[in-house]
Amino acid sequence: MSDISPDYPTLQSIGWPWPGPPEEAAWKAVFAAHPQALPARVVEQHRTGYVVADTPEASLKAESLPEWQRPRFPSHERAAVGDWVLMEGKRIVALLPRRTSIKRGAAGAHYHQQVIAANIDTVFIVCGLDADFNPRRIERYLLLVGGGGAQPVVVLTKADQTEHAEDALAVLEELEAQNIPLRAVNAKDPASVAALRPWLGDGRTAVLVGSSGAGKSTLTNTLLGTEKMKTNGVRENDSRGRHTTTHRALIPLPSGACLIDTPGMRELKPTGEEDLAEGGFSDVEALAAQCRFNDCAHIAEPGCAVRAAIEADLLDPERVANYMKLRVEVASAAEKLATRVAQNNRGKGSGKRPASIDRPGRR
């Protein structure tokens, strides 16, 4: 790590968002509170701690804030891969505000949020064109991305292993109509993967998300031009992978961009902050607003614009069914979130530290 002053041009090479010192008031305030600290980016996240870097070539194990080590400390308020922190020596002394993020509801009965990646420009939703292909899961990922400030791009891998790539793209054409880019690639072929270049320019940060075995690590290796990430095969009976990536890591690419690889995620629960219109269902939401009844369930009500669109083959009925399911899940999570916020507000008077819920803005 540097021990003099921030080298902003070098920091830009790992995603620093400005040519010099921070320009946002919230960031300036944190810097002012820690005048001796230097910025660094979280490039690895492990159960035992973090690895941070202030150049593409050098990194170090960092000592986290003491409160982050408390079992009941909100997980989404701890640093995640992609976060910017302030360092004094090897110690993290502050977490800088997130500009964007992708989050999910953590597994378990109690309400928690988990940050998958922070300060990202693009989310590559990776899905294999084999038994892994699942439009409903893609829609769930799009919901989690929506409202977080990053651009979603659906990447269909293993395009070389199927004759049905065009059929898969047709299934997802309703998404493309909402300006959600779709790309079918052979993850092992640099010429094919070049289709992702528009989102991997100098200083930009992208994250790969998708199920285990979808080809995320293979895609990472091709973009790097080297076998940096370990890859395994997939089970022939169900095309499921063996969790090649075991932790989240930020990797500088030759293009000047940064790429975050993530382990496959089995559970994708909403946080309650999602916006269905921004999460891949803007067309369904627009039609729902035209229904005769405000509380239309889109099942058999008269004057239902959504059912009319389905009957006219303008909407995929399975996609609408998934929309209805996700709408219920978001509403349920929103109730749990409201309860948690109310509990935190009551805790203010007792001297307990409230757990804030960050809502990143669009970049």
Curated annotation (Swiss-Prot):
Chief location: cytoplasm
PROSITE patterns per record: ENGC_GTPASE, G_CP
GO cellular component: cytoplasm
Pfam families: RsgA_GTPase
Residue positions binding Zn(2+): C291, C296, H298, C304
Catalytic activity, EC: 3.6.1.-
Keywords: Cytoplasm, GTP-binding, Hydrolase, Metal-binding, Nucleotide-binding, Ribosome biogenesis, RNA-binding, rRNA-binding, Zinc
Transmembrane parts of this sequence: none
Domain CP-type G: 112-268
Cofactor (UniProt): Zn(2+)
A single GO BP: ribosomal small subunit biogenesis
Ranges where the record places region Disordered: 340-363
Family: Belongs to the TRAFAC class YlqF/YawG GTPase family. RsgA subfamily.
Assembly: Monomer. Associates with 30S ribosomal subunit, binds 16S rRNA.
Protein name as annotated: Small ribosomal subunit biogenesis GTPase RsgA
